[in-house]
Regions:
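Conserved ATP-binding/catalytic core of the eukaryotic-like protein kinase fold
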Residues: 1-135
């Protein structure tokens, strides 16, 4: 995928990978900004129920407006590729920060409050995050 252009998104790097798919950094060549693209794996995209769930989750997440939750810009399909276009967040993944060494109590409390606040915002809209991890 690296170096490939899909629709008007030029893929520049891979950010992560999980059970549902792969996330890439890309340039939105129409708007001139960097975004994250979350691709549903081809095997899962062939399952109508999983594809519908992927799309439902993107629509639900798009209803959220919170500083600690990335903004969903859209759902796209190109040929057999299904993906979500999201805000690209700048910063360090929590898992990487944890690997660097112990966090002091003030940092732990600050992070915990931010995470709890984001989850409360989602829960207030009936959304339950089923895959919490420090990434």
């Amino acid at each position: 995928m690296l170096g490939k252009t899909i629709l008007h998104y030029h893929i520049t790097s891979q950010l992560g990978e999980g059970g549902m798919g792969v996330v890439y950094e890309a340039e939105d060549t129409n708007l001139g900004r960097q975004v994250a693209l979350k691709f549903l794996t081809p095997a899962l995209a062939g399952d109508d129920n999983l594809l519908q769930r992927f799309q439902r989750e993107a629509r639900a997440a798009s209803s959220l407006n919170h500083p600690n939750i990335c903004t969903i810009h859209g759902i796209e399909q190109f040929e057999s590729d299904h993906f979500i276009v999201m805000e690209l967040l700048d910063g360090e993944a929590l898992v990487d920060r944890i690997r660097r060494g112990p966090l002091d109590i003030d940092e732990v409390l600050s992070l915990g409050v931010q995470i709890a606040d984001a989850l409360e915002s989602a829960h207030s809209k009936g959304i339950v995050h089923r895959d919490m991890k420090p990434a």
